[in-house]
Regions:
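Glycine-biased strand-turn-strand hairpin within the trypsin-fold
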Residues: 24-34, 38, 45-46, 52, ...
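Extended, small/polar residue-biased N-terminal targeting/export presequences
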Residues: 47-107, 155-157, 161-172, 180-182, ...
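Acidic, polar loop-rich interaction surfaces within structured domains
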Residues: 290-293, 301, 305-311, 316-354, ...
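Bacterial N-terminal signal peptides that target proteins for export
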Residues: 1-9
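Conserved functional hotspot residues or short segments at active or partner-binding sites
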Residues: 340, 345-431
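Cleft-lining beta-strand/loop regions that shape enzyme active-site pockets
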Residues: 22-32, 36-53, 84, 107-111, ...
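Hydrophobic helical h-region of N-terminal Sec-dependent signal peptides
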Residues: 10-14
Length: 431
């Protein structure tokens, strides 16, 4: 690793070596614990119906954490297992992204390129009617994921229906090791590179580094060199703190990337940029929006405060807290908020977010104005926000057609990179 932590450590998904539960501090605490034990026993012995003691305890643990901030929670074994899969970027599956259509039916959002599903003719929008002979009606996404994923080499049987074809068809898919790509990239016009970071999982820094190298190679074949870079952090929910630091460090050669403060606002640690491994300098701009959260906000804040990249878009989500995952013996875990993080200039992100240097609103074509929920709006949960539908336009024949969406934020970032004197001045200072 080319970044250093003073005392920060791996604070998102690595267990820390301190006791999970402190010893009761007084007699009152002992009495409350005794009361809890008695209530549990009475329910087991006398409740009108048989109940699962394990489920009762799980519910009680969730109840304890529900009175704290929204990011402190108890994770039962199945949820914790899923979280580890999401951050590792590898799992046994069939290569489909799941979701719901407007009728709230389970559908395939997109099949993965070269995955088992696409090879069997599975298409975007296909309804998932049943899995291994069981109807998927009223299934949650979590239930569906658990059924679809499994050990490499095993099979899953799915009954599907194409979007515009009433005839159902069955596929038997053999599970393979699937890799979740957290980074996408492409070379835009005028030699400008584009890198999108979808989340911060294991090896995201390596993916960004590879993307940058490939953009350089592509640019050298056309205009000679990479003229600029757009880093897209929109709708990036965050992820691993150490990966956020590593990605920021790719573009920085000096300065504090992030610092954390715990209970009583005491400094816990800080991560500093290092010269070694820093990517070659090119003018750069970073796009953020209301969905840019947590680890993504660390990267955006560091690039902005240290003068490496201006931010373009709308204010970010505002999740400026750090969570630690503590493994429990039964395979479950406690996710607990242990600190707040601050940008290089000491700015708190919690409930505030990063403010863009260049404000450019998104023009998502929906009929109703949507107020995006940010961290400051959270209490016990985040309510689901549903779009009411796309606006429609009419062609010359009078028929309606979907409104074409222009990514005005990306387009503005391109124009800014091509014309702004800001980057010319920065380049002159580096000479």
């Amino acid at each position: 690793m080319k970044f250093t932590f003073s005392t920060l450590g791996y604070v998102l998904l690595m267990a820390m070596a301190f006791p999970v539960f402190a010893a009761p501090s007084n007699d009152e605490t002992y009495k409350k614990l005794e009361a809890f034990s008695k209530v549990l026993g009475y329910i087991e012995d006398h409740y009108i119906e048989k109940v699962s003691t394990t489920q009762l305890i799980d519910d009680a643990l969730r109840g304890i954490t529900s009175s704290l901030d929204p990011h402190t929670t108890y994770l039962p074994p199945d949820l914790y297992k899923q979280m580890k899969v999401d951050t590792s970027g590898e799992f046994g599956g069939v290569g489909i992204e799941l979701g719901y259509n407007q009728e709230k039916e389970l559908v395939v959002i997109a099949p993965t390129e070269d995955g088992p599903a696409i090879k069997q003719g599975v298409l975007p929008g296909d309804r998932i009617l049943s899995i291994d002979g069981k109807s998927t009606a009223n299934w949650s996404l979590m239930e569906t994921v658990k059924k679809v994923r499994g050990a490499r080499g095993t099979t899953v049987r799915m009954m599907l229906q194409h979007k515009d074809d009433p005839k159902a068809f069955e596929v038997i898919l053999k599970r393979e090791i699937m890799h979740i790509q957290s980074v996408e990239y492409k070379l835009l016009n005028d030699g400008i590179g584009y890198i999108q970071v979808k989340s911060f999982q294991e090896k995201t820094d390596q993916e960004v580094e590879r993307a940058f190298a490939k953009l350089q190679a592509q640019a050298s074949k056309s205009d000679g060199k990479l003229q600029g870079l757009i880093l897209d952090l929109r709708n990036d929910p965050g992820g691993l703190l150490d990966q956020a630091v590593a990605v920021a460090d790719l573009f920085l050669d000096d300065g504090v990337i992030v610092s954390t403060r715990g209970r009583d606002n005491l400094l816990q640690g800080e991560a500093k940029a290092q010269v070694q491994g820093t990517l070659p300098y090119v003018p750069m701009i970073t796009i953020i929006n209301e969905g840019t959260a947590s680890a993504a906000e660390i990267v955006a804040g560091a690039l902005q405060d240290l003068g490496r990249s201006p931010l373009l878009g709308t204010p970010s989500f505002g999740k400026g807290s750090v969570q630690n995952i503590i493994d429990l013996e039964d395979g479950s875990a406690l996710k607990i908020t242990i600190a707040r993080y601050f940008t290089p200039k000491g700015r708190p992100i919690q409930n505030v977010g990063n403010q863009p240097d260049i404000y450019v609103s998104s023009i998502t074509p929906v009929l109703d104005e949507i107020d995006m929920v940010r961290e400051k709006d959270l209490q016990g949960r985040i309510e689901t926000i549903e779009e009411s539908g796309l606006q429609k336009t009419k062609d010359k024949t009078g028929k309606t057609e979907p409104l074409k969406v222009v990514d005005i934020q990306l387009k503005t970032a391109q124009e800014y990179l091509k014309s702004s004197s800001f980057f010319q001045n920065k380049e002159a200072k580096r000479q």
